[in-house]
Each structure stands twice: as C-alpha cells, then as structure tokens.
C-alpha cells in the first residue's frame, strides 16, 4: 500500500498551529515521538509561555483595531523654544505642521557637548539635518557620520539613526521633517515629561503608557526589537494608552 504524505502547505499550517495552540502542539510532539527526547521536553516546558505571548500579541492588536486612531492634533502654542534637560539640547520650532499644512516641520536644535538621543527609526517621515555651526555626529545604521558647518545628511524612512555631539563645543543645526507627522506633539510631550520629573535621568518616560503614545504619535521605533513585532505592538499599545486616557497627561505641554 502506498504511504500517504502530508503536503508542504499543510505541514506549514500544522507547524504554525503547534506554536500558537499549545495543547495541539503538545499532542503532536508527543504523538510523533520526536527524537531526541530533549526536543519534546523543551517544547513542553517553553511552548506554553511562548504560545501565551503570541496569543496576547494577537489579542492586543485585534482589540486595538477597534479603537479610534491617535489624536495627533496640538493646540496653538506661543512658546517656540523648548529645552530637553536630560539630553542637553534645546529645540526651536521654525515651521510647524499647522503653518505648512502638514507638508513639513522645521526646527533649530542647539546641542551641548556630550548631548544626543537614542538609536531609533521612523516609518512615516524623512529627517534632514543641516549644520549651521559646529560639528554634528549622526549615527547611520551603526556607523558615525560627521556633518560639519554648511553640510547636510538625511535619515531616510526606516533607517536606524541617532544624533549626538562628540566635540568640545556646542553645535547648532536645522532638522526638517517631511512630511510633518505629529513631530511637534512628540517633542513637546517627551520634553514636557522630562522637565516635570516624569522621566528617568536618561530621558525614558517612567510611565510606559506615555512612551507608547510618544512613539505612536511619530511612528518612531527603538533598537533592540524586530520591526515586525515592534511596529504593530506600538501601534496597538499607543491606541490603548489613548483609550485609557493617558494622552490627557500631555495637555499641559501640548494645549
């Protein structure tokens, strides 16, 4: 009698189910008598928490899909310059999203020696740097790029980057965001938390819901977590944070 074989697509589906539905996977692993024995015991011990994480991830993203989109609006502010006390620089808004009808935002940054920000990337806008005075170091995918007076560099969408000042003198530079994507609300919210004692000394919000909102407003993501996990997760958690009312904590800084 000819032995029947399982098609490759069906094998793939069964493998996915084994990871997502723990009881199904447990049954298949022990029924098939996988060798060596440590494979079965490894799945038995680690499969449950892994399966629960996948189900929680799916549950969060599905729940958030029914929630309203983020409110990226900001009030009319008279203060054009704000200070980042943790990272040692100030930002002056030259052109806001309201003033350009969402086409771009432009700021002037004055960065002290030793100041800078963390590795991150954006999925919704391009970030253009133009140095006015001094020397700026822009990290691009792990490699430092020195930008001197009168010169430019660009961080494209999806490019991991950061800026910092390794020189002994302050550096001043323009940053242009195209298109404008709640950049002003992101900056005002983040700096507001720092200056009101609601962030750690290295600038991270003490309340994780605040962090999810700040990242969500500008579609920005940090290093260390793969994009296919981080991007839908931040999108979902930022909407849940708004649903829980944590966005109201930013009103003193943005309204």
Question: For the regions a protein language model found, what residue spans apply to each?
Answer:
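Membrane-interface alpha-helices
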Residues: 3, 24-50
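Membrane-interfacial loop-to-transmembrane-helix junctions in polytopic alpha-helical membrane proteins
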Residues: 3-13, 35-38, 118
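Hydrophobic, aromatic-rich membrane-embedded alpha-helical segments
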Residues: 8-30
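Alpha-helical transmembrane spans of integral membrane proteins, capturing the lipid-embedded, hydrophobic core
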Residues: 16-19, 48-53
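Jelly-roll (double-stranded beta-helix
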Residues: 54-89, 93-104, 116-119, 123-125, ...
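Short amphipathic
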Residues: 107-110
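Structured binding elements
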Residues: 129
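A cytosolic small-molecule/anion-sensing beta-strand core signal
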Residues: 132-133
């Amino acid at each position: 009698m000819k032995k029947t074989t399982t098609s490759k697509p069906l094998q793939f589906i069964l493998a996915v189910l084994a990871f997502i539905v723990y009881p199904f996977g447990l049954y298949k692993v022990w029924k098939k008598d996988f060798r060596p024995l440590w494979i079965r015991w490894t799945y038995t011990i680690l499969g449950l928490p892994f399966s629960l994480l996948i189900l929680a991830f799916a549950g969060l993203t599905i729940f958030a899909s029914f929630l309203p989109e983020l409110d990226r609006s900001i009030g009319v502010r008279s203060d054009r310059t704000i200070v980042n006390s943790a990272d040692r620089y100030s930002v002056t808004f030259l052109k806001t999203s309201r003033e350009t009808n969402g086409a771009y935002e432009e700021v002037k940054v004055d960065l002290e020696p030793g100041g800078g920000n963390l590795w991150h990337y954006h999925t919704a806008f391009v970030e253009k740097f133009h140095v006015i005075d001094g020397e700026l170091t822009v990290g691009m995918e792990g490699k430092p790029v020195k930008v001197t007076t009168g010169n430019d560099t660009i961080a494209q969408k999806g490019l991991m980057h950061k800026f910092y000042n390794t020189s002994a003198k302050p550096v001043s530079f323009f940053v242009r965001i195209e298109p404008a994507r709640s950049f002003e609300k992101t900056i005002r919210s983040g700096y507001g938390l720092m200056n009101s004692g609601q962030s750690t000394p290295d600038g991270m919000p003490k309340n994780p819901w605040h962090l999810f909102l700040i990242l969500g407003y500008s579609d920005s993501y940090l290093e260390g977590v793969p994009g296919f996990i981080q991007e839908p997760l931040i999108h979902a958690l930022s909407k849940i944070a708004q649903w829980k009312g944590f966005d109201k904590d930013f009103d003193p800084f943005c309204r």
